[in-house]
């Protein structure tokens, strides 16, 4: 992997703690950072984002090698971590700061995301429409250090939250098998 060959992908899918591991464990992924994007304030804090006044959503930004793990595959992984029919948050996490969004960094990513969303909608997998927003990537602000790699640092808390939030059951019911 050379720095020149790396690209960025940014996804919001509810609590960012739950979004890191599915990407971090894939080949060709250099790093996954938890943070905030899509709002109107500069350098927001977790507390500010949770207040609902910043316009930001919790998100992850992935640095990846598209020759090893193409953007299309990242989008597939993304869908399988979310409830794409719920625009008002994800699982127990409600509100604008947990809204699902695919943030595209270029026109190719936009086209891939839009086609993937249309295909998922047409597939009939869900009875409700696919409402995940597709939006142009804006400034991404890394979250506080204690949020980074949460699944590694706080394994028991992370695993418990996956279950308690309803995310694990939803993924099992809608995406497995």
From Swiss-Prot:
It is an enzyme of class 1 (oxidoreductase). SUPFAM superfamilies: Peptide methionine sulfoxide reductase. One of its GO terms (biological process) is protein modification process. Keywords: Oxidoreductase. GO terms for molecular function: L-methionine:thioredoxin-disulfide S-oxidoreductase activity; peptide-methionine (S)-S-oxide reductase activity. Its EC number is 1.8.4.11. It catalyses: L-methionyl-[protein] + [thioredoxin]-disulfide + H2O = L-methionyl-(S)-S-oxide-[protein] + [thioredoxin]-dithiol; [thioredoxin]-disulfide + L-methionine + H2O = L-methionine (S)-S-oxide + [thioredoxin]-dithiol. The active site is at residue 15. It comes from the Bacteria. It holds the Pfam family PMSR. The keyword Membrane does not apply. InterPro entries: Met_Sox_Rdtase_MsrA_dom, Met_Sox_Rdtase_MsrA_sf. HAMAP family: MsrA (MF_01401). Belongs to the MsrA Met sulfoxide reductase family. Has an important function as a repair enzyme for proteins that have been inactivated by oxidation. Catalyzes the reversible oxidation-reduction of methionine sulfoxide in proteins to methionine. This is Peptide methionine sulfoxide reductase MsrA. It comes from Listeria monocytogenes serotype 4b (strain CLIP80459).
